[in-house]
């Protein structure tokens, strides 16, 4: 078994909506990013890549490459997952924690889980997504941005 941890953060800027966990969420602010700014999928992709010792999302999809400008993070996750499977890994489970004062994530979490399960080709029971606030402390608490942490468990596929 191999465990990976991922983290991502994006500042608010411009107009919304935002995309979190593949879900378009209406909000008056957008997130500043080279890609679509999906902190949940970026953290998850990093966790998966880390567990497989394949580096991180910035190594695979550098923000200096114009090809990834405005990229769909679901496609980045699927491509990373293809590479991880090619190394002989299967998924144990993933756990994602979104850290945001606003907007409220709870109504969108079921769809996030569906999208992540689809992209990883796994059962919904293998995907957990939750959200929390920082009780108005720090940059997320002041409404300056959104952060996310993710953990992934991989196992070597049976031969």
Swiss-Prot record:
Q: Which top-level enzyme class is recorded in the Swiss-Prot or TrEMBL entry?
A: lyase
Where along the sequence does the record put site: Transition state stabilizer? 34, 133
Residues that bind 4-CDP-2-C-methyl-D-erythritol 2-phosphate:
8-10, 34-35, 56-58, 61-65, 100-106, 132-135, 139, 142
**Cofactor list:** a divalent metal cation
Q: What InterPro entries does the annotation carry?
A: MECDP_synthase, MECDP_synthase_CS, MECDP_synthase_sf
What is the cofactor note? Answer: Binds 1 divalent metal cation per subunit.
UniProt entry keywords in alphabetical sequence: Isoprene biosynthesis, Lyase, Metal-binding
An example Gene Ontology molecular-function term? metal ion binding
Task: Write one Pfam family the protein is assigned to.
Answer: YgbB
Q: Which GO terms describe its biological process?
A: isopentenyl diphosphate biosynthetic process, methylerythritol 4-phosphate pathway; terpenoid biosynthetic process
Q: Which family does it belong to?
A: Belongs to the IspF family.
HAMAP family named among the record's database cross-references:
IspF
Subunit-level organization: Homotrimer.
Q: What is this protein called?
A: 2-C-methyl-D-erythritol 2,4-cyclodiphosphate synthase
List the taxonomic lineage. Bacteria, Pseudomonadati, Pseudomonadota, Gammaproteobacteria, Enterobacterales
Gene from which this protein is expressed: ispF
